């Protein structure tokens, strides 16, 4: 159940950022890919999906993420969503269609 929600969030965000899932789950610091991953963390934690599940789902996609990175990404995404109405609209739309 949580895996399907995670997959929906990941696909939706990748689509919005015009990147592939492979790009989203690569070890890169490119800003738009980092933003995409951080928004994924924010959506999952707000759902709520346990951090241990998020970590496992990311690992299943080839991306090793630490708990501190999840926390930092969540906080960064929260600031981004609070300051940019376009990101706020995007995550709201994704959340409204996640069932």
What are these model-predicted stretches?
Residues 1-11:
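General nucleic-acid-binding
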Residues 11-37, 65:
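Short, Lys/Arg-enriched anionic-surface-contact patches
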Residues 33-49:
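Short, amphipathic alpha-helical "recognition" segments used to contact nucleic acids or chromatin
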Residues 45, 74, 78-81:
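DNA major-groove recognition helix of helix-turn-helix
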Residues 50-52, 56-72:
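Short, basic interhelical loop/turn and adjoining N-cap
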Residues 80-99:
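Short Lys/Arg-enriched helix C-cap and helix-to-coil transition segments
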């Amino acid at each position: 159940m949580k895996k399907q929600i995670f997959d929906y969030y990941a696909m939706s965000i990748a689509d919005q950022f015009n990147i592939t899932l492979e790009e989203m789950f690569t070890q890169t610091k490119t800003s738009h890919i980092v933003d995409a991953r951080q928004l994924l963390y924010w959506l999952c934690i707000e759902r709520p999906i346990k951090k241990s599940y998020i970590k496992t789902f990311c690992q299943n996609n080839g991306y090793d993420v630490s708990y501190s990175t999840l926390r930092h990404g969540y906080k960064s995404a929260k600031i981004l969503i609070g300051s940019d109405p376009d990101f706020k609209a995007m995550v709201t739309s994704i959340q409204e269609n996640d069932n």
